[in-house]
Amino acid sequence: MKRMKVLMLTFLMTAALAACGSSGSGNGLSGSVSTNGSTSMEKVVLILGEQFMLDHKDVKISYDPTGSGTGIEAARTGTADIGLSSRALKEGEKEQGLVETVVALDGIAVIVNAENPVADLTLEQLAALYTGSADWSSVGGSGAVAAVGRESGSGTRDGFEFITGTEGSCKLAQELTPTGAVLEAVRSNSQAIGYAALSAVEGKEGIKTVTVSGVACTEETVLDGSYPIQRPFVFVTREGEPLSETAQTFFDWAASADAAELIRAAGAVPTAK
């Protein structure tokens, strides 16, 4: 069961946080800021929230990791100050008065079991593996494919399926909600293939990332656009509905160049210069 995460300071992030204070530190802000949505944005939201609370002792920032679709709806209904989405807003969502602000970019890494000999796949091959029209033998491996995907409404899933052209046609062996469950499913099954945020797969044992059309998923290739499977990390708010002073201050700082190093430390690619 998902639980609201109230951000707590961690010793591991102390050095990074100390070097990247939010603007307006100690200006008397107080109150709470609620964020809700993308599980892929967890590291980014946690490190930004921790720094902001370090600088503003009377502010509490909460993060509810419900998935992009739920976060967008939370922003629309006003049950969260800031919705979190790891995909761009759809036209229908914009027509409902929602506004997106891209704070970072993230590559969607394609992962296989560490024992799988396959090292590179094209978008067309990925589509074939996920729709069931090909097995591992067609791309240098052997046996059936156990395609692992995210739940309906996941921004990671929406991004992956849109880019690979597999919307509505994937044949999934497992459909999982948290990113960690996808990593574990691939780690424990030699026939599995999955996808996850770049920041989530780095350094994980038992899995490996494959290149896509010869391009590795790295910060550099995401930023320069050469890696084909990437998506935005988005703050979602309501047009014409002002945030509280505290929430607006957090929003402005998180979307600025002042927060860029923290976003980078969380494994994403900042968009602010």
Briefly describe each language-model feature range.
Residues C20-G69, E73-K273:
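Exported/periplasmic ABC-transporter solute-binding proteins
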Residues M1-R3, H56:
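Low-complexity, intrinsically disordered short peptide segments enriched in small/polar/basic residues
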